[in-house]
Amino acid sequence: MKSDNGILMSNINKPNKCYYYCIISEQWDELIYNITGGKITELRGTYVHPKLIIHIASWCNPEYAIKVSEIVLSYHAKEAIKEKEKLLQKKNDKIDELSLKIDKQNKQINKQTATMKKQTKIMKNQTNMMKDQKSTIKEQDKKINELLSKSNEVLGYAKDTNRKITHVVKERVPYSDEPKIEHQFIIMKNNDEPIKPKKGESPKKIYDYTALRIMNKSKSSTMNRYFKDHPDGETILTIDYTPNAMHLWNQCKKELIEDDKIKSSGTSSSSFNLKKGYSENKLKKDIKRIHNLRLKHPE
């Protein structure tokens, strides 16, 4: 059997035939060609493509075929080793990369650990300082309590003394060398006429009495203002001299309200009405009594 190029194909086995046709299918013009003419006889003969000559030689010489097999096996072994080395190198690179990351993390951990140790030491020192301070505070509290106990005792004596001094200052002040700055306490009866409210308005509350606390120097202007609001007002009680007219009225008002004898227009007001059963004469007697009681020295 001959090929298209005239080569005998009778001794070519099936795998080699496949190889031959695979080479033919590649883009080479000729795989096997003959040179028969020409002046140079040394060039005459059959020429084969380099990819095919090795197989032809292997067909012709078993020893050569073994040699080719060894070379091929060695080549494949080297390629396998190269691939394995590449894979190992890749893994080694990955290991190196991970090692660098681990080293970096370890450095950070070590740094954080050192910081935490430092902070722990500081906290221990602060705790010890707080314990010392707590002990000091307890000692100070003990001393403070002792001082408070003593000061409370002294304060009690001081309050009692101050109460007596205050009473003397308020109630036993001698007459001033300047009468114009002395106080007067006056109770006025207003005698106001009820005012009919306008449509839609509530009736205005009428108070029958007014307490005036005035200084002699301003008595005229104070009375003028009073009579402007209460044209028909009249004086029912005058205490010509009292060291503190405001204090006197507050004391009178407090007692009379508590005894349900008067109704005041407000806590800071001087206008009031008498309760049922309580007369004008009783009012004057009570005010004089309270004024005289204030002049007595407390025990």
From Swiss-Prot:
Keywords: Coiled coil. Residues 1-75 form the KilA-N domain. Residues 76-150 form a coiled coil. This is Putative KilA-N domain-containing protein R879. It comes from Acanthamoeba polyphaga mimivirus.
